[in-house]
Each structure stands twice: as structure tokens, then as C-alpha cells.
Amino acid sequence: IASSSKMLVAGVLLSLQDDGLLDIDAPIADAVDWGSSNPEITPAHLLSNSSGLIGLFPDPGYGPYVCQFLPAGTLQDCAESIFTSPNDDGDITPPDVAFNYGGAQWQVAGAVAEAVSGKSWAELVNETYVQPCGVESLAFNNHFTQMGEGFNYPVEFNSDPSTLIATDNPNLEGGAYITAPDYGQLLLMHLRGGLCGDEQVLSQEALDTMHADRIAAAYDGSAGGAGTGYGMGWWIDRESGRISDAGAYGTVPWLDLEDGYGAYLVIEATSGEGNDLASQLYDIVDDAVNAG
């Protein structure tokens, strides 16, 4: 589901904050030994694409961060190499100065989650989402060098996780796979105060943190245009209030928090095609829901 993975990643870290294992506003140096290389960066910076590290664009293959796309090695080793690399020193900025979407900052976020919990990313996903919400299809891998061509849907996957090799270095910003009904369950969790059935997956405070326009509050930032904000894993349409987490392969999940509904558009194509179709559906879906 490519970048529709991001809200899932943010939720894992907010769950750890709910459990008292992580403070998303504290320097990650408090959580990992190698965090002192960039002592001002916090998990909140990472999850809002505001860490100052190099984002996914304009160069997805940015040399110092290339391990994010490789299934070899571990998430810990990859994140440490990213965070401590001297080869990005001329390119990075202080945190909360600019919005740099995606990229290796999400690997760092996942490694911090592993470190404070003492669990692997796979174990965290299982405990946070799979078990309480029954979303058995959800897992992460690192498919980018295994199949497909970057931002085009990897048709070789064919909805079969066995086509991927096992990895201890999943791609966090874009490596999740999940069926549409299971993703829908997680959207419902966001609309039901963090509940999956009787299980409290995330607190309402955690959800509010993810859904709020952090970049506006922190540094009067915008995400590609004055009308677009970003929370933690969620794009925010500042005019309508709609939040979304679209992916490169055509998935577009969105929530209307005011009206209390969500939708999940799934096509196996490109982000441009997915977003174009979603833009045609937003008002149609909204009118249908509000018509009762």
C-alpha cells in the first residue's frame, strides 16, 4: 500500500507513548545511543516529515540513506547508518524548519520504536494492530528492490506475501501490505475513539495528536501548498478538514472526522491516478453519507 503505511507507523509510536515507553516530543537521543548525532530531533519531527533529514524527493535514491530500500540487514543498523552519516551534513536542516515528505526519517522512527519496546517491528505491528483488531493480513516488508519499478504498482506481488523474502529491515514509510477490509477496520478504529471491539488500541489523545495539523502549529508550515497541512501520518485538507494518507500505488484512505465517516479507495496503479479518482469521489461520498 506504499505510503498508506505511514498512518500505521505513526500509530505504533503513539501507542508506545500511551504505554509510557516513549515521549514523542523528547529527543530520540533519550531512546537510542546513536541519537546524539542529531540531538534536537524528536519522534514528533520524524512522524511529521519535519526532522530536517532528507525526504523522499527530489532524489529517492539519495546515497547516504539507500539502506531504507534494501531488505538486507536490520532496521536498527539501517536507522543508525542514516542518522549518523556524515555524508548528509551539507544537505540537512534543523528540525521544524521545512516539510520534507517521506524518506529515511520513517526508518529512524521505526528503529526508535524497536529500541524503547525491546521488540521487533513485526512484533509491534502484531501487538498494536493484528491481535486486537483481527487484521491478519497486515505486515511490513521491503519490496522495492525485489519487484516493481519504484512508484508503479508491483504486479508481481499478486497479493501473495510469499513472493517476498523475509526481512529484518522492513521499509517503514511504504512497505505495508494489507487487504482492503482489514485496512477499513483500522480506519474504523480511528473513528471509534481508538477501539477495536473492546480493545483500546490508541487513546483519543493519541488520535488527536495524529490528526492535528502539527506543521502549522510548530512552524507555520505547509505541505506542498498553503491549503495542505500534515499531522503524523496524515495529510490535512485545511479547507474541508478531511485527512488522508494516499500511497504511490493508488490507495487513498480518508477520514471526515466532523461527519464521522471514512473511506478507502484501492486501485493498483499510481498515486496520480488514485488521487485524481479520489478527488472526483470526495463530494459524491460526502453527499451520500450526509443524505442518510
Predicted regions and their residues:
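Structural recognition of the beta-strand scaffold that forms the well-ordered cores
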Residues: 2, 8, 45-48, 100, ...
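Short, surface-exposed beta-strand/loop micro-motifs that present aromatic residues
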Residues: 175, 249-259
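Active-site SXXK
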Residues: 1-25, 106-114, 183, 260
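Short, glycine/proline-biased beta-turn/loop segments that scaffold the active-site neighborhood
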Residues: 23-38
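Hydrophobic "lid"/C-terminal helical patch
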Residues: 13, 186-187, 285
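Short, surface-exposed loop or secondary-structure junction motifs
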Residues: 39-245
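Short, gly/Ser/Thr-rich active-site loops of penicillin-recognizing serine hydrolases
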Residues: 215, 219, 272-292
